[in-house]
């Protein structure tokens, strides 16, 4: 019996999501230590102290189920961003929410629009529900919003937009998004995936929650894995109009957010100093990456995220493999249709130094531009 024959039709064409290589795996494979992982856009400052203290206070209560509605976390999010608790949906990471949006608003033969070179989970969730994927060719490695509008049809149910985009780091301004949303029919749900929004400079950051007042079909999705440092706990949230939030919470699994994730998220919601420290390091070190690439004539895509994508003008897999032997893990993105690129997470200064040294050795970079 081949069980693929009884699987959902959409599942048959899927391949499992390939995460960045874990440090422990490379240690086992090559027997090396002092490895630097710059592959998964994780927080280089580690787990925030505010969350550690909150977890310690929660440990004696783990025999109880978590708060299924996440009342205290919703209250903290609402207070921080000036929204209402009934606008909020909590997820087991923002990936959980992306799947939830697809299950709630699209079905078999409905159309889902997203960009070429956008987050790979968008096509995964689209195919899993047997919906029709409409991948719009990228414009300068980012979203072609006019192309999105042209692709709209009576069958379009859902649009995914990552801002900043992963894995390219492209960024859409608030004016661009506002003009786009004004042209999208209200019956089409637009998901604005802001997993990396904290890394944008405050002066240019999109006030996405204000857009919710103008566009009732908008959902803003955010993650606590990146700037907030809670990747291992899996927690994210979405903000939408209350009617959409109600529908999402009908589909959302009960207890999808565990107690430690909830209590940690509540703590970091008020830990502005930690998030600013992370963002400032990212801005400073991003400039070093850009200067390095310019110095050695390496093309890169300007990024507003906590990563930079470099175009090596040749298949990048051998470069990736050699970097592994130097104890540096980065992210190959051939699965995104970008076989000549590698995505590098912005780390601490010493981690970035190790990458620069390793890449110069791997590419034999001697002649500065």
Regions found by a protein language model. Name each.
Residues 69, 217-301:
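PLP-dependent aminotransferase class I/II
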Residues 34, 84-88, 108-111, 155, ...:
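Short acidic capping loops at alpha-helix termini that bridge into adjacent secondary structure
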């Amino acid at each position: 019996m081949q069980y693929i024959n009884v699987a959902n039709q959409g599942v048959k064409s899927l391949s499992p999501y390939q995460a960045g290589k874990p440090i422990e795996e490379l240690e086992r494979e090559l027997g090396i230590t002092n490895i630097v992982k710059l592959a998964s856009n994780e927080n280089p400052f580690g787990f925030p102290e505010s969350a550690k203290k909150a977890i310690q206070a929660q440990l004696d209560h783990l025999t109880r189920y978590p708060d299924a509605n996440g009342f205290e976390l919703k209250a903290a999010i609402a207070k921080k961003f000036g929204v209402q608790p009934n606008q909020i949906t909590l997820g087991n990471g923002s990936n959980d929410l992306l799947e939830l949006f697809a299950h709630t608003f699209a079905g078999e033969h409905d159309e889902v629009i997203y960009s070429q070179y956008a987050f790979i989970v968008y096509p995964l969730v689209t195919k899993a529900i047997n919906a029709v994927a409409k991948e719009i060719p990228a414009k300068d490695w980012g979203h072609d919003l006019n192309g999105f509008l042209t692709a709209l049809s009576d069958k379009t149910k859902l649009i995914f937009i990552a801002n900043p985009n992963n894995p390219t780091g492209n960024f859409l301004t608030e004016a661009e998004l506002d003009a786009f949303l004004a042209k999208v029919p209200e019956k089409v749900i637009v998901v604005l995936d802001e997993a990396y929004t904290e890394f944008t400079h405050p002066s240019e950051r999109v006030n996405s929650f204000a857009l919710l007042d103008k566009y009732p079909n908008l959902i803003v999705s955010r993650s606590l894995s990146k700037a907030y440092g809670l990747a291992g706990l899996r927690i994210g949230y979405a903000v939408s109009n209350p009617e959409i939030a109600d529908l999402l919470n009908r589909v959302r699994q009960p207890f999808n957010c565990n107690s430690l994730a909830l209590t940690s998220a509540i703590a970091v919601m008020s830990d502005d100093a930690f998030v600013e420290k992370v963002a400032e390091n990212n801005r400073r070190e991003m400039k070093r990456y850009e200067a390095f690439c310019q110095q050695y004539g390496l093309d890169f895509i300007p990024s507003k995220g906590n990563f930079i994508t470099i175009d090596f003008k040749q298949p990048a897999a051998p470069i990736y493999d050699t970097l592994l032997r130097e104890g540096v893990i980065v992210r190959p993105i051939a699965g995104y249709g970008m076989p000549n690129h590698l995505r590098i997470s912005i780390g601490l200064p010493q981690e970035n130094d190790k990458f620069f040294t390793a890449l110069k050795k791997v590419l034999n970079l001697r002649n500065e531009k």
